Regions:
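Bacterial N-terminal signal peptides that target proteins for export
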Residues: 2-12
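Hydrophobic/aromatic-rich core segments of domains that either
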Residues: 269-378, 383
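Charged, amphipathic alpha-helical linkers/stalks
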Residues: 170-183, 335
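Beta-strand-enriched, solvent-exposed domains that form extended recognition/catalytic surfaces
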Residues: 30-169
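Secondary-structure boundary elements
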Residues: 180-266, 308
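C-terminal motif of bacterial Sec signal peptides marking the signal peptidase cleavage site
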Residues: 20-24
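Bacterial signal peptide processing site
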Residues: 26-28
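Intrinsically disordered, low-complexity regulatory regions in eukaryotic proteins
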Residues: 218, 243-268, 290, 372-373, ...
């Protein structure tokens, strides 16, 4: 089917969130004539109240590339102080912890007795953030230096969440809802090393001989996606509705999202898990996917043409609607085939009975027809909700084009 797809860019959300760094450089220290005391400086450290003293690794990891390219980052921390004298050099040092490397902030202050606030760049420990599978607590230590002399120190205790916890929205300090639904794209991880093993498994079943992306016809694109679908069914991947987290926050909305390896190894997925898993594989073989978000549900879309003029939809939860492994032959009989006769043509069934088709031929047809059913599952819903998708103010209906979002959102690397 030929359709025109419009997706809403998340870039305007960054302006709402205020992703700015303050770039600063060190200057020569000019010593004060009088000693400086901590009560003069009134050094304070605060963490963004909207996140209720919790650090979300997925948010930091997903936007790390945007920060690196643009010299901007979250205003999660705020340093405030009063300048005790003219022309002072300020340094705030954050000691290393489980979630960050040593981070130094520098500023040059001119006006005496003026209170200043800064939003520093934090040197996060990205590898540690990727490894945080369970919530926990971390203590951060800050030291404030005026012209090279330490004048004060502060400690801040924060909670950290699991890297699997995807923040898809929060209430800011002014009571406004900030949509972060596009963060689901961070769980699409085309760089996961396990994808190569999975693709070898797909090729082993000989549905396709190679992955060629858009180098062939639309039919060849569809066959590549079906080959992936068929392998998931042979692995007996089942639907699992687990989405809840232990997060007690009333301001931050989040959902547990399984990593690629968790789906691959445990053969369980909900609508989000299955969609980001398949999107990860499609990105790897150069077929461009998108995620479709509707109230309480997510499904997958993929372009069947490189110019994005054609696309198909796929209901990923239906991958577990059949169990190919329970169809087998023994003692001259075939077991459990009757459950799936609705997926088999009469011609193929008769050919099987007459010995002209194998049980594997039957299973392949069952799998393919389940794939076509999943392709058609959401067409009516898509057409009905088209106006909602095109409404930038309706955050419950969104389309997340992964290749477009890669400009700002990177895989979190799990």
């Amino acid at each position: 089917m030929k359709k025109k797809l419009i997706f809403k860019s998340p870039l305007y959300l960054f302006m709402l969130f205020g992703l700015f760094f303050l770039n600063s450089c060190e200057k020569d220290n000019a010593p004060l004539e009088q000693p400086v005391y901590s009560d003069q400086v009134n050094f304070q450290v605060a963490y963004d109240q909207a996140f209720e003293n919790s650090v979300y690794p997925s948010l930091i990891l997903g936007l790390s590339n945007y920060s690196a390219r643009n010299g901007e980052s979250f205003e999660l921390f705020k340093y405030s102080m009063v300048n005790p004298a003219e022309h002072t050099e300020v340094k705030v040092n954050l000691s290393p912890s489980l979630i960050n490397n040593e981070s130094a902030f520098h500023a040059h202050l001119d006006t005496v007795d003026k209170e200043r606030a800064f939003f520093p760049m934090i040197n996060w420990n990205y590898e540690n953030l990727k490894s945080l599978k369970q919530p926990g607590t971390v203590d951060l230590s800050f030291a404030c230096y005026i012209n090279g002399e330490e004048t004060d120190d502060k400690s801040l205790r924060l909670n950290y969440r699991s890297v699997n916890e995807c923040v898809y929205g929060f209430i800011d300090n002014d009571g406004n809802y900030i949509d972060f639904g596009w963060m689901f794209a961070a769980y699409v991880n085309e760089n996961n090393p396990s994808i190569d093993n999975f693709l070898q498994e797909v090729l082993y079943h000989h549905v396709v001989d190679a992955f060629i992306g858009y180098q062939g016809s639309k039919e060849e694109v569809m066959n590549q996606v079906f080959a992936i679908w068929n392998t998931l069914q042979l692995r007996n991947v089942k639907y699992s509705s687990i989405t809840a987290t232990s997060n007690p926050s009333q301001k931050v909305l989040s959902q547990y999202v399984r990593s690629f390896d968790e789906v691959y190894q445990n053969s369980q997925a909900n609508c989000v898990d299955g969609s980001v898993f398949l999107a990860s594989v499609l990105m790897k073989i150069d077929i461009k996917p998108f995620l479709v978000l509707i109230p309480g549900h997510m499904y997958l879309g993929f372009y069947t043409s490189e110019d994005k003029t054609d696309f198909e939809l796929l209901e990923t939860t239906m991958v577990g609607s059949i169990n190919l492994n329970e169809i087998y032959e023994a003692n001259g009989q075939v077991y459990n085939l009757n459950k799936y006769l609705g997926y088999v043509s009469l011609d193929t069934y008769n050919r099987y009975l007459n010995g002209y088709a194998t049980l594997e031929n039957l299973k392949m047809e069952i799998s393919y027809n389940s794939f076509l059913k999943a392709i058609n599952q959401n067409i009516s819903s898509w057409n009905y909700n088209r106006s909602a998708f095109n409404n930038p103010d309706n955050v419950e209906y969104q389309i997340f084009d992964i290749s477009e979002l890669r400009k700002v959102v990177q895989p979190i690397g799990i």
